[in-house]
Regions:
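Conserved active-site tyrosine of GNAT-family acetyltransferases
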Residues: 67, 233, 239, 243
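A hydrophobic/aromatic-rich effector-binding and dimerization subdomain
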Residues: 50, 64-143
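Short, Lys/Arg-enriched, Trp-marked, Pro/Gly-tolerant hinge/linker segments that flank
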Residues: 104-115, 122-186, 196-204, 208
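Generic protein-terminus/edge-of-domain signal
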Residues: 1-52
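Short coil turns linking two alpha-helices in DNA-binding domains
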Residues: 186, 234-235
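Terminal helix-turn-helix DNA-binding modules in bacterial transcription factors
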Residues: 173, 177, 196-234, 256-257
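Short, charged, intrinsically disordered terminal tails
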Residues: 95-97, 148-149, 245, 253-257
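Short hydrophobic/aromatic patch on the recognition helix
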Residues: 190, 194, 238-239, 243
Length: 257
């Protein structure tokens, strides 16, 4: 990720989008990030300016590029760059893996796939009146264009009940067996139904709920420790480890200007 940057970050279940701009005092050489890896698929968009991604002996500087899960890489960038992160265990994430990473861990992505969405995102990012909901809408659309049509059935009342229950109990231990009891299903049956209707395994979905909760609390000004406890992490170190594994940065780096 990039230091010396300002920007906006939005999260939704199974994905997130980070739009970052180089600080005004950054020169033509841009900001150089440190080499790192993370478990989420990363798709990088040059909204204005430029970037270059490096992974091993590969180097990509196209308008849009993607990095496979757990691939060590570094970025140098200037201008405004967007990162869309997708959970690789999700239905959409698995579709992206099949589509992009059959031969290489760092790939260019055809800009025609996204139409006007990158320009829409840049305009929305520059408009201080644009809501978080609008940014999430654009982020979801970008992820959807990348994964292609992923069939998710209409909402199941039992799954909706489990999601509401899990969201209300994030500060406690959440077990599949307890969730199954809420749904009135066996654990094995809930596991199958949950993936079918959300695109994410139950355990992964709960982890993203916890990350969303922690980010929300931290953005309100809570300490990292308080945010971690409210979201059901053991402590701030546990939250930071989880965050770094998923996105390649510590949770404390969310406090960008």
């Amino acid at each position: 990720m990039l230091s010396s940057a300002r920007g906006r970050i939005v999260f939704w279940e199974g994905a997130s989008m980070w739009v970052l701009s180089a600080a005004p005092n950054v020169g033509k050489e841009g900001i150089k990030g440190t080499p790192h890896s993370h478990h989420a698929v990363q798709v990088t968009f040059a909204l204005d300016g430029w970037y270059r991604l490096e992974s091993g002996d590969q180097s990509v500087g196209t308008a849009i590029a993607a990095v496979a899960p757990d691939a060590r890489h570094a970025i140098t960038a200037n201008g405004t760059v967007a990162f869309v992160y997708i959970e690789p265990e999700s239905v959409a994430g698995r579709a992206v893996l099949r589509r992009l990473f059959a031969k290489r861990r760092l790939v260019s992505v055809d800009t025609a796939l996204f139409g006007s969405l990158p320009a829409d995102l840049l305009a929305a990012y520059r408009d201080p009146a644009v809501t978080e909901g609008r940014l999430v809408e654009i982020g979801r659309a970008l992820a959807s264009r990348l994964s292609g049509e992923v069939e998710i059935p209409t909402e199941d009342e039992r799954v909706a009940k489990v999601i509401a229950w899990a969201g209300a109990h994030l500060a406690t231990s959440i077990r599949l067996a307890d969730a199954a009891a809420v749904a009135g299903l066996s654990p094995d049956r809930l596991r199958h139904v949950f993936v079918r209707h959300t695109g994410l395994p139950f355990r992964t979905y709960v982890l993203w709920l916890r990350l969303l909760k922690a980010v929300e609390a931290f953005s309100r000004g809570e300490s990292l420790t308080t945010a971690a406890h409210q979201a059901g992490f053991a402590d701030s170190a546990h939250l930071s480890r989880t965050f770094r594994r998923t996105f390649g940065v510590a949770a404390a780096e969310l406090r960008i200007s």
